Amino acid sequence: YASRPIPAMQGLDRGERVIYVGTFSRTVAPSIRMAYLILPPALLEVYRAKFGHAAATVSRLEQEALRRFLASGAYSRHLRRVGNLYRRRRDALVSRLEPWGEVRGAEAGLHLLFTLPGREEKELVAQAARAGYRVRGLGEYCLKARPIPGTLVLGFAGLAEEKAEEAIAENRDFLDA
């Protein structure tokens, strides 16, 4: 959100070895159960030989509707719209969190790291849960490295801009502790 997207891996790949696997469930709607696989030309025939017999479980009608959605440019417009929406949500949350701690990793993605200096991660997670928020501590994502103490992983995709101020106001005691 803070800069232009990084180039696609396929565009950087000189040996045609990049494979893309994804789904439209997160970018369009959870009910769309369609995935995609983009293979380099050299692997396409191997894939067809090994897996060509597997029948698609998605109806042709749904596939055609998605094909038209993609071909019309509507999907690209949708991604731009939601990107702008997520940027506004991120900005609203970051501006309200910065007075209490350090925000990291907000440049891209739908999560950020929020550090409250001098606080214990487990207690922060427990306090957030008591206040009705589902958050995780950074330590849950670390196998060997020691996480930054007092750091929460906060998602903002589902946080409406106007709710950011409300959430901070409701939790001033938690933030000030």
Give the location of each predicted region.
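Short hydrophobic/aromatic beta-strand micro-patches
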Residues: 38, 113-117, 155-157
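Structural signature of PLP-dependent enzymes
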Residues: 47-54, 70-94
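Active-site pre-lysine segment of PLP-dependent enzymes
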Residues: 1-27
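Short beta-strand-to-turn element immediately C-terminal to the catalytic PLP-Schiff-base lysine
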Residues: 35-41
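Short helix-loop capping/hinge motifs at secondary-structure junctions, enriched
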Residues: 15, 41-46, 76
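PLP-dependent enzyme catalytic core of the Aspartate aminotransferase-like
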Residues: 130, 146-177
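Conserved glycine-rich beta-strand-loop-beta hairpin in the small C-terminal domain of fold type I
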Residues: 67, 83-94, 102-115, 127
